[in-house]
Amino acid sequence: MAKHLFTSESVSEGHPDKIADQISDAVLDAILEQDPKARVACETYVKTGMVMVGGEVTTSAWVDIEEITRKTVREIGYTHSDMGFDADSCAVLNAIGKQSPDINQGVDRADPKEQGAGDQGLMFGYANNETELLMPAPITYAHALVKRQSEVRKAKTLPWLRPDAKSQVTFAYEDHKIVGIDAIVLSTQHCDSVSQADLIEGVMETIIKPVLPAQWLNKDTKYFINPTGRFVIGGPMGDCGLTGRKIIVDTYGGMARHGGGAFSGKDPSKVDRSAAYAARYVAKNIVAAGLADRCELQVSYAIGVAEPTSISIETFGTGKVSEEALIALVRQHFDLRPYGLTEMLDLARPIYQSTAAYGHFGRNEFPWERTDKAEALRADAKL
């Protein structure tokens, strides 16, 4: 039997890079709410006592960048200067300008269906059948741990928790089937008064055990809870944060390839985001249809051109039909032009802030997680 380990990590909504992602997507949502056809590329930088919001926007909307920023930081939980970051006293700098007309002329068309891609690039979508969500287990449970940390913190179940946290989970596999969890890392920011012993017990009993399936834990599973022994200074006081620096956390935890483009702060005309969502939609429906146990789809674009420049599929030896047949089915059932995929997934609306923490995939509230094409794919594959 072939044995291997695979590790994925996640970070909480209070991690500096995720603060930046959430602010960028909060700005995007506020603009799309007023102007669904807006062009938005919003980048955020956070550091002790300050937030800088920049980028390029073309819109008829007006939004209050400062108020959106403060509200987002407040909801995350940075509300007092003893955390090193306070929503009500931090400086907010606005450096947003207009989108280049050179880009705009390549994207907009008289016929909306011929809308060109907002940039060149390559995107990947992935699905497998090792969880009910058709997502890899390591990233799924890494997200679940930090999401649980946030829930426990906001409920004040463990009142010494602070917003910044990271998780990492190592799964053991035999012949690509999960046989257990080898190691768990959870580091959480905390107030100065809690003892290491109380912290370890609280995290184990209140965060780790309720989240991870008991059948995957055994006497050899290793636990690393705040392994440095102290994590009082965190958030933007500990590290600066930037939009788009957690692209592997945002996607498949490293189990699939990545085209390099970040998601947050980008409207659906940016195929870095919208085509990656569509690629996940395609891959998930292929796996849901039983056409493969694992599926990775790559799609690529040229700026100003509507049709993808390439579509390729890898099923890692698990496909029930040829990859050429799968590509033909994809072309038949999915419109991967920028306008088509925006319509197919109803992307021109304010749904993005909630994507900006705990992963963009494997969450059934999002339209790219539907499996409504699976039955038709299976029928046309004649399985």
Curated annotation (Swiss-Prot):
Which GO terms are recorded in the biological process aspect for this UniProt protein? one-carbon metabolic process; S-adenosylmethionine biosynthetic process
Q: Which residue ranges does UniProt annotate as crossing the membrane?
A: none
Which controlled-vocabulary keywords does the entry list?
A: ATP-binding, Cytoplasm, Magnesium, Metal-binding, Nucleotide-binding, One-carbon metabolism, Potassium, Transferase
* Residues annotated as binding ATP: H15, D164, A165, K166, R230, F231, D239, R245, K246, A262, K266
CDD domains for the chain: S-AdoMet_synt
Q: State how the cofactor is bound.
A: Binds 2 divalent ions per subunit. Binds 1 potassium ion per subunit.
Chief localisation class: cytoplasm
One Gene Ontology cellular component: cytoplasm
Which residues make up the binding site for L-methionine?
E56, Q99, D239, K270
Positions of Mg(2+) binding: D17
Q: Which cofactor does it need?
A: Mg(2+); K(+)
Q: Which PROSITE patterns match?
A: ADOMET_SYNTHASE_1, ADOMET_SYNTHASE_2
**Record Gene3D superfamilies:** 3.30.300.10
Q: ATP-binding among the record's keywords?
A: yes
A GO term for molecular function: ATP binding
**Function statement:** Catalyzes the formation of S-adenosylmethionine (AdoMet) from methionine and ATP. The overall synthetic reaction is composed of two sequential steps, AdoMet formation and the subsequent tripolyphosphate hydrolysis which occurs prior to release of AdoMet from the enzyme.
**Family according to the record:** Belongs to the AdoMet synthase family.
NCBIfam families linked to this entry:
metK
Protein known as: S-adenosylmethionine synthase
Source organism of the structure:
Shewanella sediminis (strain HAW-EB3)
